[in-house]
């Protein structure tokens, strides 16, 4: 269920319902608009038959030409998540599936096996970003390869394919750390000595750029370690080791997102 002004009437609110799965699979969306104080159904739209089979979340955003759109996160095969984009076309007065540049195959482009990864405005620019797990982000060493995955978030909000944001997701602590695009494919991440976190290094692992660790709340900050966030009864700390263009303590503080929060 999602309440949003999709039809652009400004003085009313529209309602989008994801209806229960039918025997054909996929998801059926129902668009209702407020008429004289009552929600009335104006459209149903069937999506994703054979590709996904249940809605996990709906998100509203504004894309190119200020057009209203929806991002739907949907279950695929029960153990994976994909996303689809639906536009509201003011001329026809209806919702339509949209495959913008870079998203000709949504199920392949947005597939992720960490099903807790839902779409969101990850960079704070007002558009909805879709996460995708990628294989070319860098080298994840054992044992951190069990908890970390490289992500590329894209918003597909304009004709050129939208903005993208590269980084690493820690599934154990449920946070995303954005990294400079120049690190894409050129870094190694390995565990730190105390097994409390991980080190971002150059491709060969010979130069450490920074360390991320999770420690008790009463662990004091120091000249080296600064608190980035509080995670339950623990704190996330960061330490810069070797300078890297575009990566700084201020950058880490501004671009680390706890995904358990809105």
Language-model region placement:
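Structural motif
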Residues: 23-33, 77-90, 136-157
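Surface-exposed amphipathic alpha-helical segments
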Residues: 239-262
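Acidic/hydrophobic-patterned starts of short beta strands in beta-sheet-rich repeat architectures
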Residues: 8-19, 62-74, 122-134
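Surface-exposed beta-loop interaction hotspot
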Residues: 1-13, 63, 151-177
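Beta-propeller blade termini
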Residues: 1-8, 53-63, 114-124
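Conserved blade-ending motifs and adjacent loop-strand segments that build the rim/top face
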Residues: 97-120
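Beta-propeller fold detector
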Residues: 40-47, 96-102, 161-166, 180
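Secretory pathway targeting signatures of secreted, lumenal, and periplasmic proteins
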Residues: 180-228
């Amino acid at each position: 269920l999602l309440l949003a002004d999709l039809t652009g009437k400004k003085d009313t609110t529209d309602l989008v319902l994801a209806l229960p799965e039918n025997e054909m699979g996929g998801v059926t969306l129902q668009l209702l608009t407020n008429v004289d104080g009552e929600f009335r159904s104006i459209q149903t739209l069937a999506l994703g038959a054979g590709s996904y089979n249940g809605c996990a979340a709906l998100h509203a955003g504004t894309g190119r030409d200020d057009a209203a759109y929806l991002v739907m996160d949907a279950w695929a095969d029960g153990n994976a998540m994909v996303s689809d984009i639906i536009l509201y076309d003011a001329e026809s007065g209806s919702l339509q599936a949209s495959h913008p540049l870079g998203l000709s195959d949504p199920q392949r482009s947005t597939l992720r096996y960490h099903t807790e990864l839902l779409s969101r405005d990850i960079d704070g620019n007002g558009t909805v970003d879709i996460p995708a797990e990628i294989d070319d982000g860098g080298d994840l060493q054992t044992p951190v390869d069990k908890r970390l995955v490289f992500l590329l978030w894209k918003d597909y909000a304009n004709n050129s394919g939208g903005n993208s944001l590269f980084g690493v997701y820690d599934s154990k602590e449920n946070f995303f750390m954005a990294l400079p695009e120049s690190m894409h494919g050129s870094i190694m991440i390995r565990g730190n000595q105390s097994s409390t976190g991980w080190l971002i290094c150059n491709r060969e692992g010979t130069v450490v750029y920074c360390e991320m660790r999770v420690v008790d709340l009463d662990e004091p900050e120091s000249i080296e370690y600064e608190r980035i966030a509080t995670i339950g009864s623990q704190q996330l700390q960061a330490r810069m080791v070797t300078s890297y263009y575009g990566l700084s303590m201020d950058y880490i503080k501004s671009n680390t997102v706890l995904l358990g929060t809105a």
